[in-house]
Swiss-Prot record:
<keyword id="KW-0119">Carbohydrate metabolism</keyword>
<feature type="binding site">
    <location>
        <begin position="119"/>
        <end position="121"/>
    </location>
    <ligand>
        <name>substrate</name>
    </ligand>
</feature>
<dbReference type="GO" id="GO:0005737">
    <property type="term" value="C:cytoplasm"/>
</dbReference>
<dbReference type="GO" id="GO:0008968">
    <property type="term" value="F:D-sedoheptulose 7-phosphate isomerase activity"/>
</dbReference>
<feature type="binding site">
    <location>
        <begin position="93"/>
        <end position="94"/>
    </location>
    <ligand>
        <name>substrate</name>
    </ligand>
</feature>
<feature type="binding site">
    <location>
        <position position="65"/>
    </location>
    <ligand>
        <name>substrate</name>
    </ligand>
</feature>
<comment type="pathway">
    <text>Bacterial outer membrane biogenesis; LPS core biosynthesis.</text>
</comment>
<dbReference type="GO" id="GO:0009244">
    <property type="term" value="P:lipopolysaccharide core region biosynthetic process"/>
</dbReference>
<keyword id="KW-0413">Isomerase</keyword>
<keyword id="KW-0479">Metal-binding</keyword>
<feature type="binding site">
    <location>
        <position position="172"/>
    </location>
    <ligand>
        <name>substrate</name>
    </ligand>
</feature>
<feature type="binding site">
    <location>
        <position position="61"/>
    </location>
    <ligand>
        <name>Zn(2+)</name>
    </ligand>
</feature>
<feature type="binding site">
    <location>
        <position position="65"/>
    </location>
    <ligand>
        <name>Zn(2+)</name>
    </ligand>
</feature>
<comment type="subunit">
    <text>Homotetramer.</text>
</comment>
<feature type="domain" description="SIS">
    <location>
        <begin position="37"/>
        <end position="193"/>
    </location>
</feature>
<keyword id="KW-0963">Cytoplasm</keyword>
<comment type="similarity">
    <text>Belongs to the SIS family. GmhA subfamily.</text>
</comment>
Length: 193
């Protein structure tokens, strides 16, 4: 009944991954991001992650597997997804939704910390404001974007961009794989500490 649609969806996902994988710059960016994160942890820094919608779930997933567990038993790593509902609703109401992440960074971010900002379009105003706030705090910035990087292109220390111009879910599928690889590489880097 739906077998052709299922095959088509899986083939499109595989094609998106193959295109991403064929660009060595993507592989190098993932490695650079993992080392940057591990270096922050080694000196007492933390990572703050944020996104909207499905990207918000990815930001939470990233923090959960750093503080909890990925594949190996190891110490938890300092990671916070900016996802406290009382904070999000307070700042949205009092300042505007575009400030929900930047306000949190103003409060708890510090030099030596890292921001992971996730936006499939690269145009999310509240993620752009988060990047700006992180810069003012002296933090390093990693972004996961899609398409052409949008307004976030060129704003990060490391940008990992999925060059897909269709639906956002294809970009998110690569983002979650990148997140898992980042955690795996961080675990390897932290063993060296």
């Amino acid at each position: 009944m739906y077998q052709d649609l299922i095959r088509s969806e899986l083939n499109e996902a595989a094609d998106t991954l193959a295109k991403f994988l064929s660009d060595d710059a993507n592989i190098e960016a993932i490695q650079k991001a993992a080392v940057l994160l591990a270096d922050s942890f080694k000196v007492g820094g933390k990572v703050l992650s944020c996104g909207n919608g499905g990207s918000h779930c990815d930001a939470m997933h990233f923090a959960e597997e750093l503080t909890g567990r990925y594949r190996e038993n190891r110490p938890g790593y300092p990671a916070i997804a900016i996802s406290d509902v009382s904070h999000l609703s307070c700042v949205s109401n009092d300042f505007g939704y575009e400030f929900v992440f930047s306000r949190y960074i103003e409060a708890v971010g510090k030099e030596g910390d890292v921001l992971l900002g996730i936006s499939t379009s690269g145009n999310s105003g509240n993620i752009i404001k988060a990047v700006e706030a992180a810069r003012l705090k002296g933090m390093k910035v990693i972004t996961l974007t899609g398409k052409d990087g949008g307004k976030m292109a060129g704003t990060a220390d490391v940008e990992i961009r999925v060059p897909h111009f269709g639906y956002a879910d294809r970009i998110q599928e690569i983002h979650i794989k990148v997140i898992h690889i980042l955690i795996q590489l961080i675990e390897k880097e932290m063993v060296k500490a």
